[in-house]
Amino acid sequence: MHIMNSSQTPNFNPNDIVLNITRVVEDGTRQSALASKGDDWESVVGVLDNNEHLIGKEMSVNSHLNAVMFSEEFNKDYEKTLPIISNYYSDLGANEDLYEAFKRVKNTSLNEQQRHIVKDSIKGFELSGVALKGNDSKRFKEIQERLSVLSNQFSKNVLQATNSWKKSVSVDDLNGYGEAELSKVRVGGEYVVSLQIPVYIDLMTYAENRGLREEVYRAYISRASDVGITPVKFDNRQVMDEILKLRSEMSILLGLSNYAEYSVQSKMVDSPEAVIDFLEKLVELSHLQATTELKDLEDFAGHSLMPWDLMFYSEKLKQKIFNFKSADLKPYFPESSVLSGLFETIQNLYSVKLTEIKEDCYHPDVRVIMLEDENGPIGKIYFDVYARENKRGGAWMSDFQGLYKDSLPVAFVVCNLNSPKDGKPALFDFDEIVTIFHEFGHALHHLLTKVTFPCAAGISGVPWDGVELPSQYMENFCYERGVI
C-alpha cells in the first residue's frame, strides 16, 4: 500500500531555484559517471532513473510556477536554470561511455518494458549528437542551450503581450451580452475587455458591435508580433526566426535534411511525407463540408464574412434554427456539477475514487484531488482551472513525478476557464466541459500507469502523436446521455 507523504508534495515556495537545480544536476553528473561504467540494468538504467526522478521534480515545479504564477522576479531566476539544465542533458546525450553502457545493457536479459526503454534511450543518444566530434559537438550543445532560452522567451512574450492589451468600453458596446458575460468584464463602475480567453470568446460570440469584434480579433491574433498593437518589445518575429534557423542547423549536424526529419525520429509516424499526406487527405475530406457551412453562414448573414464574424453568426444561426442560445446551457453546468459528473464517470470506468483534499498551494483557486482505489492512494492532481493575468493561456497537463519506487504519480492539470463572479459559481459551456474531460484524460494516463520506470511511466516517453489518445477518449463521454 502506497502512502502520499511530504516528498510527494511539490514545493511551491522554493527559496533558491538556481541553487536547487545546480545541486541536483551536480549529483546527476556524478551518478551518470558511475552509470557509464555499468553493464547491467540496475547499474546503468537504474542509476539514471533515480537521477531523472530527482531532477525532473525540480524542473517540473519550476516550469509549472513560471507558467501559472508568472512574475519577473521568478522568471529571472528560472531563466538562469535553463542553461544549467540544457548543458546537463547535452553532456548526458553526448556521453559516449554512457552510450556504450546502454548498448551493453541491450545485450542482457531484459523484459519487454526494459527492452523498449533501452531501444529508445539509444536512439535518444544518437539524436543528442553522441556521434559528433570536436567543433560539431560543441556547436550542437550551444544550439540546445540557445533553443531552451528562446522557447521560454517565446512563451513569456505571448503572455506579456496578452496582458498588455485592455480596452474600456461602454455597456452599449456590449449589446448582445447577458448578465453572465457582462459580469466577467465589469471592473468597478466600468467595463474592460481584454485578450484573456474567456473574455475573448464571449466577445467573438455575442458582441453585436462588429467594429469592436474586429479590433479585439486583430489584437488577439497579432499578439507578440510586429504587425499587432501590443508593445514591440514583445515581438516574437526574431525569436521564431532564430528558432527555425537553429533547428535546421541542428538537424543538418545530425546528417538529416531538415527539422521535420529530426522531429519524426521520436514520433509514431515514420516520415514527413506521411504527415503531409495525412494533412492533405484531411483537407480533401473536410473542404466540401467547410465550404458548405461557410456559404450557409454567409447566406444567413447576407454578406461575406470575415474571421471576426464566424463565431458571432454561427451562434446567431444556431439560435434561429434551434431557438437555442449557447449561454442558456451554462446554468446547467456549474463547476460543482461538472466535477461531480467527471469524478463519477472516472469512478465507473476505472473503479477508482476521486476526493478533493485540503492542502496549501501556490494559489487559493487550485483544487487538490486525490485518486484512490481499494488499496489506497494512487496519485494526486493539482487542478488549476481559472484564467488569471499572470498565467499562460491554453489548457494542458504536465507531470510533477511519475510512478517510481515509493513515489506515486502527481500531475498538474491547467485550464483557463471562467471563474466565480459576485458570489456566484463558475458556469461552463459545453466546449469547456470537453476541455476539462480532455485534460483529465491525460492525467489519468499518467496516474493509472503500471510502469515503474521514470522514463516510461505515465506520459513519459510516449510519442507526441500518440499521447492524445487517452485524452480524446475521455472527451467522448461528454456526449453520452448518462454523463450529461
Regions found by a protein language model. Name each.
Residues P334, L417-F437:
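Short pre-active-site segment immediately N-terminal to the catalytic Zn-binding motif
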Residues H2-G176:
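N-terminal helix-rich structural modules
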Residues T449-E475, Y479:
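The catalytic-center signature of Zn2+-dependent metalloproteases
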Residues L256-S257, G441-C455:
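Catalytic Zn2+-binding segment of zinc metalloproteases
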Residues I17, K133, G255, I346, ...:
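Divalent metal-coordination and catalytic microenvironments
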